[in-house]
A protein has these predicted regions:
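GST-like fold's C-terminal all-alpha helical module
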Residues: 1-62, 67-153, 159-164
Length: 164
């Protein structure tokens, strides 16, 4: 999936890295940068992902210029595929974690890809979901509609309207 995406665009949402790239990079460095087993698998299945991590490591600064962004109407199909994948594991995990955090539970469990998943509750993940919702609520109505429709098309709208 990422191999196909990085074949069409150098970063997650356009031609320059955004905060989403740096956030994703943080996770990917653990899988590709430190663990030799998963790095070997990544090199075999998605060498562009390995190259992307190496490129991201060498970037510095954050450019607020948005002229390089792809409009939501012009996102490549690979972006939809990535978000569809997120809807299966990441979204239910974020929602279950947030509920558990609000209820003071030490762990949470939910079904992910028809399997029960249990994990320790992480306050930071609950805060991340709150930030996603706060940023969405800051959008004007036209942009809210576009973003919500994109998320709904990919199954990720539950991030905004989860059962909490």
């Amino acid at each position: 999936m990422l191999e196909n995406h990085f074949e069409t665009t150098p970063f997650l949402l356009g031609n320059k890295p955004l905060s989403s790239d740096f956030a994703f990079y943080g996770q990917m460095t653990q899988l590709i940068g430190f663990d030799p087993t998963s790095r070997e698998i990544a090199l075999e299945l998605s060498p562009r992902s390995v190259a992307w991590v190496d490129i991201m490591e060498d970037l510095s600064g954050f450019n607020e210029d948005s002229s390089h962004l792809l409009s939501i109407e012009n996102l490549p199909e690979t972006t939809f595929s990535i978000f569809e994948e997120l809807s299966h594991g990441y979204v239910p995990a974020m929602i279950a974690n947030s509920i558990a955090f609000k209820e003071g539970q030490e762990t949470w469990s939910t079904k992910i890809d028809d399997q029960m998943w249990e994990q320790k509750t992480f306050p930071y993940q609950a805060k991340c979901l709150e930030w996603i919702r706060d940023e969405f609520n800051e959008l004007d109505q036209d942009d809210k509609t576009k973003v919500f429709n994109f998320l709904k098309e990919t199954g990720c709208e539950k991030l905004l309207i989860g059962k909490e």
